[in-house]
Amino acid sequence: MSWQNNLHSVSPYIAGEQPELTDMIKLNTNENPYQPSLQVQKVIEDFKSENLRLYPSTDAKFLRKALAEYHHLNTDQVFIGNGSDEVLSLSFLTFFNGQRAILMPDISYSFYPIYCELYRIPYQKIPLADDFSLSVNSYFQENGGIVIANPNAPTGMAISLQEIEEILQNNQDSIVLIDEAYIDFGGESCLPLLEKFDNLVVVQTFSKSRSLAGIRLGIAFGSAEAIAHLYDVKNSFNSYPIDSLAQKIGEASFTDETYFQKSVSKIITTRENFKNELIKLGFQVTDSKTNFVFVHHPKIDATTLFKVLYEAKIIVRHWNQARISDWLRITIGTDREMNTVIQFLKEYLKNKEKSY
Amino acid sequence: MSWQNNLHSVSPYIAGEQPELTDMIKLNTNENPYQPSLQVQKVIEDFKSENLRLYPSTDAKFLRKALAEYHHLNTDQVFIGNGSDEVLSLSFLTFFNGQRAILMPDISYSFYPIYCELYRIPYQKIPLADDFSLSVNSYFQENGGIVIANPNAPTGMAISLQEIEEILQNNQDSIVLIDEAYIDFGGESCLPLLEKFDNLVVVQTFSKSRSLAGIRLGIAFGSAEAIAHLYDVKNSFNSYPIDSLAQKIGEASFTDETYFQKSVSKIITTRENFKNELIKLGFQVTDSKTNFVFVHHPKIDATTLFKVLYEAKIIVRHWNQARISDWLRITIGTDREMNTVIQFLKEYLKNKEKSY
């Protein structure tokens, strides 16, 4: 007997590297290349540190209200967490407490099975088709819950509002969690379905389209009943997860719709241009509705490509994992950054062909 | 069958009220009456919001390093969490995973049993003596872990380093978690015992003595092995719990030792003066080593006293709970605030005596 016998053993999630090179092109964690709204800068400048002696609002009251108004929902339908990873984590803990396995695509955000192992939630992976498309029919079976990223990561591919509605219609006895971390880059949000389904929970984040990965804010939207349960679990986990400054920064980021739309549009335009250039170079590229592309080249091994890009100080993401080990995920940066990537790949492919 | 059947049912912790009255004297959540170090203000002023587009360090690397240096420990002995509530929560999940009940005092931080219920950890409450003192012998029995707040809350009373060492000596096969949230106000930290015991975990916070309740930073110190396990669980729960600004603010608060010592001393002096005045008024007051006092008046019902204080806009804390329902916990504010409380109580007692 030793204290080590009482440990909860887990295999943790490994986040994308945050390297300390200064002259790199960092395209590995889907960060936004543009700064957050200038309203955020203003809030920070105006913040008085003496306020920090007091505890923040336990449930980020004003931020929830701002988000509810923005999305035409009630405040009690909005949950704020410490990044969407925490929102997902607490959602798994709250909603997936049944005996039956929860369902998720076999290729998706790799944190989902890790939450399941942390909380000992049985789960079943449903294979995507060979082209990474999702068939809703495979979710018409008994389950203890469903989690689907829409658009999906790392494929970038989206399913339609109608498909989500079909899943909901066939699964009214378990929570259907739709992770919309990347929804603002071209997918269709299922928030309107909250009117019809009290078992739908939609998770979004400030980290991607709002350029606020550094401040850790995530959201869950759902029925007042579901959100109340999520708050009960949150209040059994941590009283005050969102600091005062983060609450104010979150509010500020929703006051400048013009800037938001402009920076999102820019990323979408860059993505489409980048994608076309990649196709010209012989890459296979999925139909991404996100701020990244998922790519494969029939003539280059992805592990090798990851390495040569890294040596050229271009950092992308690669998984040594069945079905996707031949693929790379590349975040959309600025036009300039993506041009550098294209120029590098052109050169690399030219030299490679010469060497045949 | 319905989605509600899959819910994880809990009775959440209820934090002290954060009322929105502006002219109140808020002595209910043990906040520091003094502002944080001016270095904190400077860090906020200098912060560039464009940095927020990037994810923060997953493990608050520089802040851990600063804390390790301050306490003469190694960086791998330091864990940073989103407030000490999160640190405690993740510690319970990580370390208390055995079959045997964990032990805790019957009167202590009311979050402990709530974590146990959240994670389904069996626990046993060990009664304090009638004078709220803790007998170490009652912790010499089989257990799956031990958690003790030192100084204790809400009693404010501390145990000695030697007593903690005795507990550790008799419990080398389970984690002994010492919650030192209030340690800087007069208790003796058990950090030096980390040299001898790899099963000791010490939790501290930035919320009390560092005046940073609003920024949500908590710490666990332990053996490199214990801390690595805690990080594994944290990395299965949430990748990036501490935002970039909070990491910098935490670092800044440790650069101004003079200010820190001065504000802590001031609170201790105010506490002792306040305590003496209360005793003169007939109150029974425990020997507090914290920034609050725990008080009882033989002639006044605590529920009534709580109410009349509230009506006078003086907000303190009361629990409707066995053994302490006759007691109030009063945070130490400024001298001026505590004088107002004393004046009010003098007046109230005088009028009460008249009415006999």
UniProtKB/Swiss-Prot annotation, chains A, B:
One of its GO terms (biological process) is L-histidine biosynthetic process. It catalyses: L-histidinol phosphate + 2-oxoglutarate = 3-(imidazol-4-yl)-2-oxopropyl phosphate + L-glutamate. The keyword Nucleotide-binding does not apply. The keyword Amino-acid biosynthesis applies. Pfam families: Aminotran_1_2. The modification N6-(pyridoxal phosphate)lysine is found at K208. Keywords: Amino-acid biosynthesis, Aminotransferase, Histidine biosynthesis, Pyridoxal phosphate, Transferase. Its cofactor is pyridoxal 5'-phosphate. GO terms for molecular function: histidinol-phosphate transaminase activity; pyridoxal phosphate binding. Its EC number is 2.6.1.9. Pathway: Amino-acid biosynthesis; L-histidine biosynthesis; L-histidine from 5-phospho-alpha-D-ribose 1-diphosphate: step 7/9. InterPro entries: Aminotrans_II_pyridoxalP_BS, Aminotransferase_I/II_large, HisP_aminotrans, HistidinolP_aminotransfase, PyrdxlP-dep_Trfase, PyrdxlP-dep_Trfase_major, PyrdxlP-dep_Trfase_small. Belongs to the class-II pyridoxal-phosphate-dependent aminotransferase family. Histidinol-phosphate aminotransferase subfamily. NCBIfam families: hisC. Homodimer. This is Histidinol-phosphate aminotransferase.
